[in-house]
């Protein structure tokens, strides 16, 4: 029979890593924008409008991704906390 094994520290580290991934993505996107900005500043008319619309969609998608990553991180952390509490209650039942 296999045992259930729960690594509380590892799960907390995974939740933190998921959350920090959001920051890394934002940093990379800002770097990309900084590289594009000089070129985009020269665009006019339809080119500028098309870029701005695409950039708004990109920003919206990035914000949505950040929300999803935050939700996943929080859910993992909450599950870990709940399992830790169940573990404490089980241990206390033997006292």
Curated annotation (Swiss-Prot):
Transmembrane segments: none
Coiled-coil regions, chain positions: none
InterPro entries membership: ESAT-6-like_sf, T7SS_ESAT-6-like
A Pfam family reported for this protein in Swiss-Prot or TrEMBL: WXG100
Miscellaneous section: To improve expression in E.coli the proteins were cloned as a single protein in the order esxB-esxA with a cleavable thrombin tag.
Subunit (UniProt): Forms a tight 1:1 complex with EsxB.
Family: Belongs to the WXG100 family. ESAT-6 subfamily.
Name this protein carries in UniProt: ESAT-6-like protein EsxA
């Amino acid at each position: 029979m296999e045992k259930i094994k729960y690594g509380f520290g590892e799960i907390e580290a995974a939740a933190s890593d998921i959350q920090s991934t959001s920051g890394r993505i934002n940093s990379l996107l800002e770097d990309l924008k900084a590289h594009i900005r000089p070129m985009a500043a020269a665009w006019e008319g339809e080119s500028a409008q098309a870029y701005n619309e695409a950039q708004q969609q990109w920003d919206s998608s990035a914000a949505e991704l950040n929300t999803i990553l935050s939700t996943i991180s929080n859910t993992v952390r909450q599950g870990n906390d709940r399992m830790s509490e169940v573990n404490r209650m089980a241990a206390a039942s033997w006292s």
